[in-house]
Swiss-Prot record:
Motif extent (RCR-3): 100-103
Residue span of region Disordered: 245-272
Protein name (Swiss-Prot/TrEMBL): Replication-associated protein A
Function noted in UniProt: Implicated in enhancement of V-sense gene expression. Acts a an inhibitor of C-sense gene transcription.
Oligomer status and interactors: Homooligomer. Interacts with host retinoblastoma-related protein 1 (RBR1), and may thereby deregulate the host cell cycle. Part of the C- and V-complexes which are RepA-Rep-DNA complexes involved in the c-sense and v-sense transcription.
One Pfam family recorded for the sequence: Gemini_AL1_M
The entry's keywords: Activator, Covalent protein-DNA linkage, DNA replication, DNA-binding, Endonuclease, G1/S host cell cycle checkpoint dysregulation by virus, Host cytoplasm, Host nucleus, Host-virus interaction, Hydrolase, Metal-binding, Modulation of host cell cycle by virus, Nuclease, Nucleotide-binding, Nucleotidyltransferase, Repressor, Transferase
Cofactor binding note of this UniProt entry: Divalent metal cations, possibly Mg(2+) or Mn(2+).
Organism: Maize streak virus genotype A (isolate Nigeria) (MSV)
Upper taxonomic lineage: Viruses, Monodnaviria, Shotokuvirae, Cressdnaviricota, Repensiviricetes
InterPro entries registered for this protein in UniProt: CRESS_DNA_REP, Gemini_AL1_MSV, Gemini_AL1_REP, Gemini_AL1_REP_central
Sequence motif: RCR-1, positions: 18-21
Region (Transactivation): 221-230
């Protein structure tokens, strides 16, 4: 099977964008400048890029992008840089995303002024105001609109809804197969058309002889009670093969030229 894909329309619309470039050794400063230039039409205000290391030593890149106008794209490859493709998500909580990016960076680059989430009303402290959590419907809607493959879809669900993922994985796998169906491999005929032999009779005969027409000596001994030894069975089979081959050749050599077919003999009925 080919890798899963889908004809679904990718969609991203948000002023706060969280990008993750797996296995990307790109310099954060260079990546920031490239991403900044991609979103000029939406008036970029802030970008943060940080390079981190996986446990296996490979490098990956995180980026938080904030724009004055919501970024609207339908091309999942829009944020590709130098051949590296990112996972694109809406940053629902820019404060948490920024803290996550800055947890253990190897290198960091920032440009612009960070725009934190809105301040609490009526003089309440930030700790007194609980940030509204998105509903499961909102989370799944965002995942469906951003996922570009079956693997990415399941990975995003595992990250955002770990309990549901662990208890309802079979349902998520079913929806993943529907959203990203496997591409059926095109059938390749092992016997390509040729001229003048179009049916490849040799291959058919090679299969017919041992599977259909051939009787083993052991099977013959079971059917013939008077055959007591394997040698007798082989001798009988060789004789029958020789006789039947000659009969077939004789029939082929005596081809009929008459259109009249032999009628079955009418049998006499019972006496009245």
């Amino acid at each position: 099977m080919a890798s899963s894909s889908s004809n679904r329309q990718f969609s991203h619309r948000n002023a706060n964008t969280f990008l993750t470039y797996p296995k990307c050794p790109e310099n954060p400063e260079i990546a920031c400048q490239m991403i900044w230039e991609l979103v000029v039409r939406w008036i970029p205000k802030y970008i943060l890029c940080a390079r981190e290391a996986h446990k296996d030593g490979s490098l990956h890149l995180h980026a938080l992008l904030q724009t004055e106008k919501p970024v609207r794209i339908s091309d999942s490859r829009f944020f590709d840089i130098n051949g590296f493709h990112p996972n694109i998500q809406s940053a629902k909580s820019v404060n948490r995303v920024r803290d996550y990016i800055l947890k253990e960076p190897l290198a960091v680059f920032e440009r612009g002024t960070f725009i934190p989430r809105k301040s609490p009303f009526l003089g309440k402290s930030d700790s007194e105001v609980k940030e509204k959590k998105p509903s499961k419907d909102e989370i799944m809607r965002d995942i469906i609109s951003h996922a570009t493959s079956k693997e990415e879809y399941l990975s995003m669900i595992q990250k955002e809804l770990p309990f549901d993922w662990s208890t309802k994985l079979q349902y998520f796998e079913y929806s993943a197969n529907k959203l990203f169906p496997e591409i059926q491999e095109e059938f390749t005929n092992p016997h390509p058309p040729s001229s003048p032999d179009l049916l490849c009779n040799e291959s058919i005969n090679d299969w017919l002889q041992p599977n259909i027409f051939q009787v083993s000596p052991e099977a013959y001994m079971l059917l013939q009670p008077t055959c007591y030894t394997l040698e007798d069975a082989i001798s009988d089979l060789q004789w029958m093969d020789s006789v039947s081959s000659h009969q077939m050749k004789d029939q082929e050599s005596r081809a009929s030229t008459s259109s009249a077919q032999q009628e079955p003999e009418n049998l006499l009925g019972p006496e009245a």
